[in-house]
């Protein structure tokens, strides 16, 4: 378990909000961004590991979880609609046990990978193996995806399928899920979908097609640059 150093306790702020509510006698508006001050790293740790629509801002779970008005060390946090795991990660960082559930399989994958610590050395070692094996594969079975040729160019489909076939062969479940989530990231970026809408751009998008045709997924180079 990993603990934050000098994590604030928002008990006093909560008691002040309760008094405001009692005095007003009806609902009150709360701006969590103004309460959780000096919170510059809202996307710290693995919060930005994968995009997800309508993500909960980090300030809200940070306020409630680091708050002795509601919780104490060692308490259990349950998020029955965990989405991409924002609450789960903040719970773990605050030394709380966390459980989550979601009907969306992608959400469950994001949450699981986001909250599982993996040694960066192991990640880089496996990435090197994946790329080396992928470059030796001429072709792989393309997954059955409805309207796949509308979402991807043939080149992108072929390279993504090769990567998926190699990742599927990983024996360590934790590592496999980590790289499968990263494959999802790459797949979204290389698709012909609009960047801000979950629909396919059925009108030919020359810029997107040029990106797919020019980008060589398997040519990624591994550097020793330290990532924060």
Where are these regions (language model features)?
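Glycine-rich SAM-binding Motif I of class I
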Residues: 85-89
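Gly/Ala-rich phosphate-binding loop of Rossmann-like dinucleotide-binding domains
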Residues: 92
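Conserved class I S-adenosyl-L-methionine
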Residues: 73-83
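N-terminal auxiliary segments of SAM/dcSAM-dependent transferases
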Residues: 1-25
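Nucleic-acid modification enzymes, centered on SAM-dependent nucleic-acid methyltransferases
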Residues: 16-71, 99-228
């Amino acid at each position: 378990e990993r603990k934050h150093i000098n994590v604030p306790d928002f008990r006093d702020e909560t008691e002040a909000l309760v008094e405001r509510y009692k005095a007003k006698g009806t609902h009150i508006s709360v701006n969590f961004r103004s309460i959780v001050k000096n919170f510059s790293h809202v996307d710290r740790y693995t919060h930005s590991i994968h995009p997800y629509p309508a993500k909960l801002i980090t300030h809200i779970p940070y306020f409630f979880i680091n708050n002795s008005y509601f919780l104490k060390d060692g308490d259990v946090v349950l998020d029955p609609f965990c989405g991409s795991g924002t609450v789960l990660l903040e719970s773990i960082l605050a030394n709380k046990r966390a459980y989550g559930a979601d009907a969306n399989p992608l959400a469950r994958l994001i949450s699981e990978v986001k909250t599982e610590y993996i040694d960066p050395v192991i990640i880089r070692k496996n990435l090197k193996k994946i790329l080396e094996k992928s470059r030796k594969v001429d072709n792989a079975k393309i997954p059955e995806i409805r309207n796949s040729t509308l979402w991807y160019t043939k080149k992108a489909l072929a390279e993504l399928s090769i990567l998926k076939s190699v990742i599927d062969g990983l024996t360590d479940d934790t590592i496999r899920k980590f790289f499968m989530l990263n494959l999802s990231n790459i797949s979204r970026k290389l698709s012909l979908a609009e960047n801000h809408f979950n629909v396919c751009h059925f009108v030919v998008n020359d810029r997107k097609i040029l990106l797919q045709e020019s980008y060589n997924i398997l040519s990624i180079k591994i550097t020793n640059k330290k990532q924060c």
